[in-house]
Amino acid sequence: MNNIPSIEAVKDIRSGTCGPVAAPAVTSDLSENIILTSLDDLHNWARLSSLWPLLYGTACCFIEFAALIGSRFDFDRFGLVPRSSPRQADLLIVAGTVTMKMAPALVRLYEQMPDPKYVIAMGACTITGGMFSADSTTAVRGVDKLIPVDLYLPGCPPRPEAIFDAVIKLRKKVGNESFLERKKITQTHRYFTITHKMKRINPLVNGSYLNAKTQKAALKAGDDISLPTKSESIETTTKELN
């Protein structure tokens, strides 16, 4: 009879085993500084909050960056820090017409940028060649024939608000990427797919323009009034000096 527990002892045992679990002894300051996240979210958050662009401007669209950097728009609030070296940049903003002579330099700058890297094509001349796409023999009809483009920003020129919208859309794209599956993703844009439909023409200044039909009348008129040629004028001047 002495081994039978009392009613009070049974109540104490039940309250200790079946009662509510006590709150963990964690301070409020520590609980407010703990964030549960994944590697993808942490990596993408760090990159989209600190995009460092390399500004590649060749024409009038690039003037909009003067207003963009100013205090009215202040693109530093997006974490954009312009860099002068492609090895320190992860965003290439191409603004203006790209010519055949500048194409190798643009491709070299893109290849020197570390991965992951992104490209924004800014302006009509960058995207399609713009007003130079019809008659110019040196303008590239779209920068996507040289390097991959992630975001197209049309306009002539685009306003600073449009550039902000493009940066926000690019940040969303960066935030949805996977750290482990990035190398498995292939480009699906028009990269090296459309060729330039150009034909070779003879140079206009070839040294024989005086033989054209439009110049023969002027040469005949000069002979009729006995105008001295260039060599005769030089000989006359030399004799006078001697």
Curated annotation (Swiss-Prot):
Cofactor(s) needed by this chain: [4Fe-4S] cluster
Membrane topology value: Peripheral membrane protein
Catalysed reaction, written as an equation: a plastoquinone + NADH + (n+1) H(+)(in) = a plastoquinol + NAD(+) + n H(+)(out); a plastoquinone + NADPH + (n+1) H(+)(in) = a plastoquinol + NADP(+) + n H(+)(out)
GO biological process, one term: aerobic respiration
InterPro entries: NADH_UbQ_OxRdtase-like_20kDa, NADH_UQ_OxRdtase_20Kd_su
Localization of this protein: Cellular thylakoid membrane
Cofactor notes: Binds 1 [4Fe-4S] cluster.
PROSITE patterns: COMPLEX1_20K
Keyword terms of this UniProt record: 4Fe-4S, Iron, Iron-sulfur, Membrane, Metal-binding, NAD, NADP, Plastoquinone, Quinone, Thylakoid, Translocase, Transport
Claim: Translocase is one of the keywords in the record: yes
GO MF entries: 4 iron, 4 sulfur cluster binding; iron ion binding; NADH dehydrogenase (ubiquinone) activity; quinone binding
Positions that bind [4Fe-4S] cluster: 60-61, 125, 156
Chief location bin: membrane
GO CC annotation: plasma membrane-derived thylakoid membrane; respiratory chain complex I
EC number: 7.1.1.-
Family: Belongs to the complex I 20 kDa subunit family.
Its job: NDH-1 shuttles electrons from an unknown electron donor, via FMN and iron-sulfur (Fe-S) centers, to quinones in the respiratory and/or the photosynthetic chain. The immediate electron acceptor for the enzyme in this species is believed to be plastoquinone. Couples the redox reaction to proton translocation, and thus conserves the redox energy in a proton gradient. Cyanobacterial NDH-1 also plays a role in inorganic carbon-concentration.
Subunit structure, interactors included: NDH-1 can be composed of about 15 different subunits; different subcomplexes with different compositions have been identified which probably have different functions.
Name recorded for this polypeptide: NAD(P)H-quinone oxidoreductase subunit K
Organism: Prochlorococcus marinus (strain SARG / CCMP1375 / SS120)
Taxonomy of the source species: Bacteria, Bacillati, Cyanobacteriota, Cyanophyceae, Synechococcales
